[in-house]
UniProtKB/Swiss-Prot annotation:
Subunit structure: NDH-1 is composed of 14 different subunits. Subunits NuoA, H, J, K, L, M, N constitute the membrane sector of the complex.
Classification lineage: Bacteria, Pseudomonadati, Campylobacterota, Epsilonproteobacteria, Campylobacterales
Classification via PANTHER family: NADH DEHYDROGENASE SUBUNIT 4L-RELATED, NADH-UBIQUINONE OXIDOREDUCTASE SUBUNIT ND4L
The organism of origin for this protein: Sulfurovum sp. (strain NBC37-1)
This protein's name: NADH-quinone oxidoreductase subunit K
InterPro entries: NADH_UbQ_OxRdtase_chain4L/K, NUOK/Mnh_C1-like
Length: 100
């Protein structure tokens, strides 16, 4: 039987993958994707804990995080498109050197 610990381990592994993506990548789009992976890992943990304790609070938090992530995608991709059109790159090192 798959217990709570299995879900939490999978959630921690997925969160670790997202964290490594945030720490290792220099491209803003990849940082954006890694952040979304981390948010989805938190959603898995909330849903698993909610199911384990027979409480819907964790699932409500997960739906709230999904709504926040959707608005983040809309705003974030708009900003990334503007940055790419203006500078021609989404690399953090290039953007740091192009002040103005």
């Amino acid at each position: 039987m798959i217990g709570l610990s299995h879900y939490l381990i999978v959630s921690a592994l997925i969160f670790s993958i997202g964290l490594m993506g945030v720490l290792r990548r220099r491209n803003l789009l990849m940082l954006f994707f890694a952040t979304e992976v981390m948010l989805n890992a938190v959603n898995i943990a909330f849903a698993a804990i909610s199911h384990y304790y027979n409480d819907l609070t964790g699932q409500m938090f997960a739906f709230f995080i999904i709504a926040i992530a959707a608005s983040e995608v809309a705003v974030g991709l708009g900003i990334l498109i503007v940055l790419y059109k203006r500078y021609g790159s989404l690399d953090l090192d290039d953007l740091a050197s192009m002040k103005g």
